[in-house]
């Protein structure tokens, strides 16, 4: 998973991030390039990630941009639920880690383990490989909070979950 610092101050202000070629481009163009390359992306964010008045569309947009996970210090309650409903896994930093303390630049590769047997509020290991090859091992709290949310994620979101269950019943 390639780190895309969509939640960084620069990107919020300027709406630009690094694309797969390392060059600065719009968030949309970078997201499409990563999707075309088959590379899932991660957003790193701060405290109360997702707070605001258009939370449902924020989660939909995140999913449509090909983002598979959001790693933040904390989540706004409804937005966290909306991310899960869209099939995007929310994770929270643990042990005082955050995007600033880890000195993230957007050139990192992220690998999150333990997702094949996910359970509510499970702590999972995450390996952040910096551009220079340095590896930072951190733990994340998976903010899938309930058993039904695990099922939503396993199906790719609540809509896929409902449609598959309707198809089974038919």
Name each region found by the language model:
Residues 32, 36-76:
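Extracellular/luminal Protease-associated
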Residues 49-57, 77-81, 99-100, 135, ...:
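Flexible loop/turn segments at secondary-structure boundaries
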Residues 141-148, 155-167:
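Extended hydrophobic packing segments that form well-structured cores
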């Amino acid at each position: 998973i390639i780190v895309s610092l969509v939640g960084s101050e620069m990107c919020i202000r300027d709406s630009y991030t690094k694309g797969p070629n390392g060059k600065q481009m719009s968030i949309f163009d970078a997201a499409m390039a990563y999707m075309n390359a088959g590379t899932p992306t991660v957003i790193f964010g701060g405290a109360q990630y997702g707070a605001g008045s258009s939370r449902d569309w924020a989660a939909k947009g995140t999913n449509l941009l090909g983002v598979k996970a959001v790693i933040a210090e904390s989540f706004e309650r409804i937005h966290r639920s909306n991310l899960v409903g869209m099939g995007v896994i929310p994770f929270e930093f643990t042990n005082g880690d955050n995007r600033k303390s880890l000195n993230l630049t957007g050139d990192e590769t992220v690998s999150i383990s333990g997702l094949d047997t996910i359970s509510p509020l499970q702590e999972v290991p995450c390996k952040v490989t910096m551009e220079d090859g340095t590896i930072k091992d951190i733990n994340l709290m998976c903010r899938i909070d309930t058993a039904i949310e695990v099922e939503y994620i396993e199906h790719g979101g609540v809509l896929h979950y409902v449609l598959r269950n309707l198809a089974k019943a038919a």
